[in-house]
From Swiss-Prot:
One of its GO terms (cellular component) is plasma membrane. GO terms for biological process: electron transport chain. Part of a membrane-bound complex that couples electron transfer with translocation of ions across the membrane. This is Ion-translocating oxidoreductase complex subunit E. Its EC number is 7.-.-.-. Belongs to the NqrDE/RnfAE family. Its main location: membrane. The chain crosses the membrane at residues 41-61, 71-91, 95-115, 130-150, 184-204. HAMAP family: RsxE_RnfE. It is a multi-pass membrane protein. Keywords: Cell inner membrane, Cell membrane, Electron transport, Membrane, Translocase, Transmembrane, Transmembrane helix, Transport. It is found in: Cell inner membrane. The complex is composed of six subunits: RnfA, RnfB, RnfC, RnfD, RnfE and RnfG.
């Protein structure tokens, strides 16, 4: 794998083609489980593991699977890996598994995972496919984590609450009370609040992309960094 190729994969997975902010895939778990940091992190890590393993597995068997049964075979691979993650969560983080509920088995139908298996893993080697799964999964998990953190902060005035559900009793002290006497903001932890927060994150990303594009054009000398507006007289003559 060339360094340039790895950079392109990383840039696409984390920012340029982020599954949550650009492709808008996996919105059901993205909005349904991001009401707290621990829920978002738990689902993000589970999705990341399935994505990396499924990309690697699909890349390994791509030559042995015919076109006629390719998609069903990919779904079976993803379902088997999701079941493994589900059993691990039942064994080690059972309370968090109960909270996340149906969203863990629904990883099987997550369009992010099936999309990367079909579009990338089935056409590339194991290392490239695994790296793509890692960076795409990280991009999805980071959006989940930011969304969960913002919603928890606005909804409850805390950060990292109940992290012991994922990391054990030692994480009980990780909770940060940002606003000591905060009464809470119910909308932030409800589904409408998730839609609003996600929309704001998408708008912020688009604004950053526009600023970077303008700066790049200015440095290339195509357009001035801050073009002056032309004023038009009532006669129609431009000053």
């Amino acid at each position: 794998m060339s360094e340039q190729g790895l950079r392109e994969i990383a840039r696409d997975g984390l920012w340029r083609n982020n599954p949550g902010l650009v492709q808008l895939l996996g919105l059901c778990p993205l909005l349904g489980t991001s009401n707290s940091t621990v829920n978002a992190l738990g689902l993000g890590l589970a999705t990341l593991l399935v994505l990396v393993c499924s990309n690697a597995a699909v890349s390994l068997v791509r030559g042995a699977v015919s076109e006629a049964i390719r998609l069903p075979a990919f779904v079976m691979i993803i379902a088997a890996l999701t079941t493994c993650i589900e059993l691990l969560m039942q064994a080690w983080t059972y309370e968090l598994y109960q909270i996340l509920g149906i969203f863990i088995p629904l990883i099987t139908t997550n369009c992010v995972i099936l999309g990367r298996a079909e579009a990338f893993a089935a056409k590339n080697g194991v290392l490239r496919a695994s790296f793509d799964g890692l960076l795409t999964g990280l991009g999805f998990a980071l959006v989940l984590l930011v969304l969960g953190g913002l919603r928890e902060l606005l909804g409850q005035g805390t950060l990292l609450a109940d992290m012991q559900l994922l990391f054990g009793p030692a994480a009980e002290t990780w909770k940060i009370q940002i606003f000591p006497h905060y009464q809470g903001f119910l909308l932030a932890i409800l589904p409408p609040g998730a839609f609003i927060m996600l929309g704001l994150l998408i708008a912020l990303k688009n604004r950053i992309d526009e600023s970077l594009a303008e700066r790049a054009r200015a440095q290339a000398g195509d357009v001035p960094a801050s073009p002056q507006r032309q004023r038009v007289r009532v006669t129609g003559v431009i000053e």
